[in-house]
């Protein structure tokens, strides 16, 4: 992932798109983004976060200042070679342009190195099978009695749609990590 992220950032910086940076790599598991399910099949998720807008209207926006909740948002850093301007005219079209450009840069890199990308996918898949045979965790437990069972059903059904084996405990489960009631997934 850093290979793609760094290439995309370098290309977009080269195109003169201020405010592009790569930072805060993720561990590929978040129940908040359905796209993370791609990692269950060793796929590669591309996620672009862009500066939002209140609507489709172009407006003058102030990027967080040096003293704001995220200090130095406009400073030059190793991962942010072309920082955003302190104030910008911004619209939803800018969001679309930035995200589309990132995707197209990633596709360009893939088309330039298809064998490398395919080999990396194969190795990642092979390594995940081997580590799944010998390294914990071998599974996860979603304890029964969750406050919102519809969310549990959503996660479980999404995992099943991905071809991931999900079982339901018919009786209490006792593990080193704790005891889980019948009905746990």
Language-model region placement:
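Intrinsic-disorder/low-complexity accessory segments
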Residues: 1-30, 34-185
């Amino acid at each position: 992932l850093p290979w793609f992220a760094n290439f995309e950032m370098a290309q977009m910086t080269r195109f003169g798109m201020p405010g592009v940076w790569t930072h805060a790599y993720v561990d590929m598991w978040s129940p908040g983004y359905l796209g993370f399910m791609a990692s269950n099949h060793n796929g590669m998720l591309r996620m672009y976060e862009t500066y939002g807008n209140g609507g489709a209207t172009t407006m003058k926006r102030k990027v967080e200042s040096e003293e704001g909740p995220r200090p130095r948002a406009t400073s030059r850093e190793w991962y942010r070679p072309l920082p955003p301007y302190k104030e910008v005219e911004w619209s939803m079209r800018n969001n679309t342009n930035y995200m589309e450009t990132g995707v197209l840069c990633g596709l360009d890199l893939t088309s330039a190195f298809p064998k490398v990308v395919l080999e990396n996918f194969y190795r990642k898949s092979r390594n995940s099978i081997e580590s799944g045979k010998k390294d914990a965790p071998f599974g996860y437990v979603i304890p029964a009695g969750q406050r919102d069972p519809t969310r549990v059903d959503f996660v479980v059904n999404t995992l099943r749609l991905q071809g991931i084996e999900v079982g339901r405990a018919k009786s209490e489960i006792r593990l080193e990590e704790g005891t889980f009631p019948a009905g746990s997934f």
